A protein has these predicted regions:
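Residue-level signal for inorganic ion chemistry
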Residues: 47, 68, 124, 174, ...
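The conserved catalytic core of RNA pseudouridine synthases
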Residues: 24-28, 42, 46, 137-168, ...
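Accessory RNA 3′-end/elbow-binding domains used by RNA modification enzymes
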Residues: 1-10, 14-37, 41-44, 59-62, ...
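Acidic, low-complexity central loop/insert segments
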Residues: 58-111
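Structural signature of FAD isoalloxazine-binding scaffolds in flavoprotein oxidoreductases
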Residues: 57-72, 137-151
Length: 266
């Protein structure tokens, strides 16, 4: 099986847990997920199968959409409600107008400092491993982009919003930074990823549904083929020499592009 299966990751599973379970369900080893979701987060997790694992970087590079709930008035060490509370207040002086102004100020390019509780590595060691040892290290801000942030509901201290952003963005850090700018602190209460590139919740199935499809013999219908995944990209024909170079992992140069489809295509 070569293609992508879109899994609806449930709470309590890491992205690596999903891959491990799929290897058992599908009886195949060549599987890779296309973007980490925290254990407490849920939603769209495209998983590449077989030859489609070569496309992981292309899929991961796509913009992502989330629905999140943040709790104002609390700061935790993990920037979400699973962590240890560092400070808390029940007296919020934030108005809806102030909230909307601060939230909208994050739209566009932003230099985001990754959280200590993350899988990023420093000197070969993951940040969350250092954090669990009680260590804090300097993290360099990374450029991210927020295409849109829409507030869906305000029920202080809870605020529900939808955000579309670039890859590598931490939504719990966004919540933390919003709280910091408001002066009251904030932490992420829940997170649902609703879209990764072209893949949406409507495309997603749970691990249990995947196992059921295998048992019923309908699993092939749940997998998007490589050609379908690449349909959004321009189709370029190349010469036989170009075919040979591509097959060996070499880049294609303009001189090896041919308008005649009979010689192959990529």
């Amino acid at each position: 099986m070569d293609g992508v299966i879109v899994i609806r990751k449930e709470k309590g599973f890491t992205s690596h847990d999903v891959v491990a379970k799929l290897r058992g369900i599908l009886h195949m080893k060549k599987i890779g997920h296309t973007g980490t979701l925290d254990p407490d987060a849920e939603g769209v997790l495209p998983v590449a199968l077989g030859k489609a694992t070569r496309l992981v970087d292309m899929i991961t590079d796509k913009e992502k959409t989330y629905e999140a709930v943040m709790r104002l008035g609390v700061v935790t060490d993990t920037q979400d409600m699973s962590g240890t509370v560092l400070s808390q207040t029940t007296e919020l002086s934030v108005t809806e107008e102030e909230l909307c102004t601060v939230v909208s100020s994050f739209v566009g390019d932003y230099m985001q400092v990754p959280p200590m509780y993350s899988a990023l590595k420093v000197n070969g060691k993951k940040l969350y491993e250092l954090a669990r040892e009680g260590k804090t290290v300097e993290r360099k801000p990374r450029p991210v982009h927020f295409y849109e942030i829409e507030i869906l509901d305000i029920s202080f201290p809870l605020v529900r919003f939808r955000v579309t952003c670039s890859k590598g963005t931490y939504i719990r850090t966004l919540c933390h930074d919003i709280g910091e700018k408001l002066g009251c602190g904030a932490a992420m209460e829940s997170l649902l990823r609703t879209k990764v590139g072209r893949f949406t919740l409507d495309d997603a199935i749970t691990l249990a549904q995947t196992e059921e499809a295998v048992q019923e013999g309908t699993i092939e219908s749940k997998i998007l083929g490589i050609e379908e995944i690449l349909a959004e990209y321009p189709r370029v024909c190349c010469t036989k020499e170009g075919d040979r170079l591509l097959a060996n992992g070499n880049p294609l140069v303009q001189a090896l592009v041919d308008a005649q489809e009979k010689n192959g295509w990529i």
